[in-house]
């Protein structure tokens, strides 16, 4: 499924959103985009950077006592505490999201200064956060559920039940596909994915 990209603002490069369900292969596509010379802003990496800053650690420990020990955030403990409680998630997001946005905007400004015409924003919960409205186009990486589960389990750290629970809290793959500008089907070999990606970049006039 494809649709035309929205017009971009003259104050920043065009924004290509990148998202996908757990195990779909979004990280692989992000790597391929970097190999093709595009700047990829990784929302998860920037969120990790933000939560390493002393003032943020202080706020997090005040909001969630005990999650910071010796200046280090217990990420697993924090995730377990907020995961099933929407009010706690909202509290965490209120601390981190404005800072992550500011960080992404600063990196985007640097890309603008380098004369780049497009930047990629790699955001796992792009649709769930309503962030597609700020994108000029959105790539959704998708694959069948069982294949996604197999890949996610191979990474380790999560059980099948954990993965299914996280997946259930996101928009369905079908809804993500419906909202996408272009869908990349990652159910085949890497070469097939690369071919689809290159075709998408040509369609969007990125390369």
Swiss-Prot record:
Question: Whose protein is this, by species?
Answer: Deinococcus radiodurans (strain ATCC 13939 / DSM 20539 / JCM 16871 / CCUG 27074 / LMG 4051 / NBRC 15346 / NCIMB 9279 / VKM B-1422 / R1)
Q: What is the official name of this protein in its record?
A: Dephospho-CoA kinase
Name the Pfam families on file.
Answer: CoaE (PF01121)
Signal sequence interval, chain numbering = none
Q: Give the highest taxon in the source lineage.
A: Bacteria
Which biological processes are named by the entry's GO terms? Answer: coenzyme A biosynthetic process
Q: In which pathway does it act?
A: Cofactor biosynthesis; coenzyme A biosynthesis; CoA from (R)-pantothenate: step 5/5
Identify the InterPro entries for this entry: Depp_CoAkinase, P-loop_NTPase
What this chain does, per the entry, is described as:
Catalyzes the phosphorylation of the 3'-hydroxyl group of dephosphocoenzyme A to form coenzyme A.
Keywords (A to Z) from UniProt: ATP-binding, Coenzyme A biosynthesis, Cytoplasm, Kinase, Nucleotide-binding, Transferase
Name the SUPFAM superfamilies on file.
P-loop containing nucleoside triphosphate hydrolases (SSF52540)
List ligand-binding residues for ATP: 23-28
CC terms in the record's Gene Ontology section: cytoplasm
Protein family membership: Belongs to the CoaE family.
Q: Where is this region: Disordered?
A: 1-21
Q: Does the keyword Nucleus apply?
A: no
